């Protein structure tokens, strides 16, 4: 039990969520490293949302609201850290949610699918039963895209992105919104 008085309480709660997700098998092994990297930048920024980041959030929401087919791309980290928030946001802005994993396995996809269903969201895309297409310019498992989701989306929100896929999505004419925890990228 983490005491709420701990100066890094919120950070430790998120860290526990990541560890739990790893144990449950829907988080890639390297996901803990990615989380730690993001956490380090958070410390450097003073654990505050910067003014430019707040402005970017407003612009991102406006872009999604003006889109005809917005999709939120989720992975294991996003699911572990913010599943309820992702679902609420998707419902609020009328966006679809699609599973898209760099280290894609049927087992991970099934576990993430079940988590979204348990949390009340049954229309999850990117499942093994979905009509999957492939984005030709991407040379890894993230090339998979639901025909009615990322493949045909006009706007894609990509939380926790390193940039390679976001760049390719943008080149295909999609508006691409990333939540990159690295302020230097």
Residue spans for each PLM region:
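Electropositive, gly/pro-rich neighborhoods at or near active sites that engage anionic ligands
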Residues: 1-96, 107
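Active-site glycine-rich loop that binds ribose-phosphate moieties when present
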Residues: 132-151, 157-164
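Alpha-helix C-terminal capping/helix-to-coil transition sites in glycosyltransferase folds
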Residues: 66, 151-152
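Long, charge-dense
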Residues: 88-142
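Hydrophobic/aromatic ligand-binding patch that stacks against planar heteroaromatic rings
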Residues: 89, 148-149, 167-169
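Short, ordered loop/turn segments at secondary-structure junctions
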Residues: 75-77, 101-104, 181-182
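Glycine-rich, acidic loop regions that bind phosphate or pyrophosphate groups
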Residues: 2-4, 157, 161-185
């Amino acid at each position: 039990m983490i005491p709420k008085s701990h100066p890094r309480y919120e950070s430790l709660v998120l860290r526990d969520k990541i560890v739990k997700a790893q144990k449950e098998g829907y988080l890639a092994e390297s996901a803990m490293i990615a989380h730690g990297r993001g956490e380090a930048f958070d410390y450097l920024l003073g654990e505050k949302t910067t003014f430019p980041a707040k402005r970017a959030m407003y612009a991102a929401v406006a872009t999604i609201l003006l889109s005809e087919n917005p999709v939120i791309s989720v992975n294991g980290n996003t699911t572990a850290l913010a599943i309820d928030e992702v679902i609420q946001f998707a419902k609020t802005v009328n966006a679809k949610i699609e599973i898209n994993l760099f280290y894609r396995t049927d087992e991970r996809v099934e576990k993430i699918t079940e988590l979204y269903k348990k949390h009340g969201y049954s229309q999850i895309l990117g499942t093994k039963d979905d009509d999957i297409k492939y984005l030709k310019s991407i040379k890894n498992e993230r090339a998979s895209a639901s025909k009615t989701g990322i493949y045909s989306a006009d706007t894609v929100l990509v939380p926790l992105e390193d940039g390679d896929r976001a760049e390719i999505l943008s080149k295909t004419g999609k508006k691409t919104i990333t939540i990159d925890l690295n302020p230097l990228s």
